[in-house]
Amino acid sequence: MTLADHSPRCRFALSIVQQLRAAGFQALFAGGCVRDQLLGKTPKDYDVATSASPDQVMDLIGRHKTVPVGAAFGVVMVPGSHPSEGAVEVATFRSDGQYIDGRRPSSVRFCSPAEDAQRRDFTINGMFFDPLENQVLDYVGGQADLQQQVVRAIGDPVARFSEDKLRLLRAVRFTTTFRFRLEPATELAVRAACHQINQVSVERITQELRRMLAHPERAHACRLLLQTGLLYAILPELMNTAGTETQTSADLHARFHMLQHLQAESAEAAWAILLQPLLQPAAADQHNSLTTVDSLLKRLKMSNQEIAEITWLIAHRTALTGLPQQPLHFIKPLLAHPCSHLLLAVTEATHASQNSNSEDARFARNFLAAHSTAQLDPPPLISGNDVIARGIPPGPRIRTLLESIRNAQLDQLITTREEALQLLQQQIAR
């Protein structure tokens, strides 16, 4: 393999390898960056594996230029001098001791590259590349599995997943995002250990799900999560949402079909589709249903913005139905919302999955194209002070009057402040 990436990130990582090699240490690119280059993809970041100890790495590169993020595990971070260079993780070749928390080893022993490869998760991630000699070092059969498009655990899959439970989700993500196959023994090990996924921190689980749901292969990911038992282990709320196991399965697969048609690369839009079964059919009470969704998202420790966007999309999931017949004061605020483009994508995915008419979505897209943000959400013509100044005491009537004037403005019945004040006076006099 010839190094084809000439980005600042690659050049920076290469400079670290050159420094280490010049000092007499072994240094290689490792893991995902090797996999990506063999696949013809540009790596997002670079990891370097070396025979140098963390102290030797910091002494060589400069302690003021390094961050010992996991020195006890042989890991040092080297930030670039410019944002375009990113940061390179430099790890000493190591063999891990016993895993006691399902995530990190209790101890490490520095070793050779061949031994280091055995501790890694999957064969496609277990290769090294010598950028100075343009040579791939493959001790685990990763190149063959890349060619055969297989995700296979290194060594005993049961042991690999026992060491680090997050690998259960990573197996699904790599399989689906690369459009590979999950090797049978590896899949059996995932199924057997699926309920252990909750030993991993919620934040890490959510991050893996976020990455899967934002990817175009999200439907494939959800099907494999269901097939391996991980979906219900992480989201037990989705069990029996349609009354019976058969109905629930059919409804979930219908959601997966919608996800297959979702064009937006948005995890929030995907979540809105995936969680809709929580509102059907027993969840007739919209408020209580959204409370259930909100509680689930908070349990997953999503950000307030993510929760707000997902719950808005679910609450407005049918808002585009019959949109051409709605008044402008309904259409404009809906389409002015920051998530309206995602609502359109969700609606279009729903129609596409059902082979139904998407005239409402087309109308919305045309309306958005024909109206600027200022036209969709113009500044109000009057304020609450104008209402109070006309003798209306503070209370709910002020809001009612303001909404009435605002609706008239959005319906283009009034266009100036003078007209708004005149209409306000008329409504007060009624």
Predicted regions and their residues:
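Catalytic cores of the polymerase beta-like nucleotidyltransferase superfamily
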Residues: 1-430
